[in-house]
Every structure is written in structure tokens, then in C-alpha cells.
């Protein structure tokens, strides 16, 4: 269980509350969550050990054109990991719903409105693109590169989070490898609803024991934290216990409410230019 579930900054969230669905544009529906809540718990200061983005895909984006004809698109939002706030996902959904019966003059006006409002909520400039559905005609479902660590014949009896599974997990020769798991599951900090994801860990350093890494990832199964916070916890725990020279942690979560969240954290300064779906997305 997260130590900050009862933080005063979370008290006013619509998440977990009965809410009305507004179909007229209303930017005030967006709700920020300070990233400092979990970063204080991780002993992270202002100088972060990573860069990256939260990559959101907006599958239920619809509005009316100037003549009242409904329009649909798929949107992508890239929210910098350096922003003071993350955006709470239910409030994001409610905000997008408020476009549904609102007339806009152009697609560019939609993109500009999203960019302005999300930047204000996050506290730092975000990148927004919206695309027509036909742009996705030939887009394939992909799998993460590298080796999957899930097919191990091990017995697990505890599903409570424990970073100590990573103790002494990195030994031996220096390697560069990509590992991934589809068994990442945590729970919403407020509602306890399950969050399902796949995670890729790319690193250069002493080789990480795959059994210990898998046990660590499975220990998130009863853990309560937002998607972005889980990924930052994975990054900082691996850096603490395994001390790789280079590390990237990239998780892609299944969608909820027409949104998926794909946090990316790295100390290599690179971010993915694409946003390809995995099988469960």
C-alpha cells in the first residue's frame, strides 16, 4: 500500500466518486496530481535520475464540427516526466467527454485546445497530436524487443510489494540486454481497480538475475499506486540494487475509459518516436 494514499492533495479527486458526465467543453474537469507525492517516498529530489514522458493514447476523442457533424480522431499526448504534475486519468476522461457535444471550427483548434489545457494542468508544456482513423490502417500490433522473462518454472506465494527481491540480483559480467514481462499488475491508488501492463527493462550493467527480477515485478500485484509512479519505483529500485550504467524502463498499460498510459523513464536521454500498440492494447 502506498504511504501517501491519504495525502491532502488527493482528497478532492473525482476518482472513486460518483460524477456527472458533462458533454459541453469544460477545462476545469482536469485534475493534477503532484509528482512529488511518490518521489518524496522514493527519496528523489529536484534533480531526477531519469528523463522521459508519459505517453497517453486517446481512443475516444470526439467533437462536433462547425456544422454540428460529429468528428472522431485518435490522439496522442506526451507529458514530460519533468512536469510538476501528472494528470489524473478519470479527470482526463471526463474532460475529453466534455468535447462530445461542443462545436469546434477545425481539427487544429482541437489540438490547440488540448495542448493549452493539458499544459496548464501538468505545469509544463505537453505535446499533442490528433490523427484520423485511416492513418492507423496498416499499423501492426507489436511485442517488446528482447527476452521475455515470464516462462520460468518458479513457485510464488507472496504478492505483496518487496523491493528486496532485487537484493544481490546483479552479478557477473557486464551485458547489454532488453528484458520484458507481461505480468505487471498493480492497483489504482484510490479505487483498487486492477491496472494491467507489460514492461520492458533495457540496461547495460552486471547481468540481472531473471528469477529475482520476475519475483520483484510480480510483487506489484497487490500494490496500490498510479501507473507513472510504479514505473518510477521500478526504475529507482533497479538503480539502487543493480546499479546499471544505463537503464530504461518502459511500461505499456491496457486502456481504461478510452485511454492508455505508457510511462517511459530513462537515463539515456532517448525517448521512443513511435507509439505502437501491444497485443492487449
Curated annotation (Swiss-Prot):
GO CC aspect terms: cytoplasm
Residue spans making up a coiled coil are none
Under Enzyme Commission nomenclature, its number is: 1.7.1.13
Q: What is its main location?
A: cytoplasm
* Binding site residues for NADPH: 89-90, 256-257
Q: What does this protein do?
A: Catalyzes the NADPH-dependent reduction of 7-cyano-7-deazaguanine (preQ0) to 7-aminomethyl-7-deazaguanine (preQ1).
Q: Which NCBIfam families does UniProt cross-reference here?
A: QueF
HAMAP family for the chain: QueF_type2 (MF_00817)
Name of protein: NADPH-dependent 7-cyano-7-deazaguanine reductase
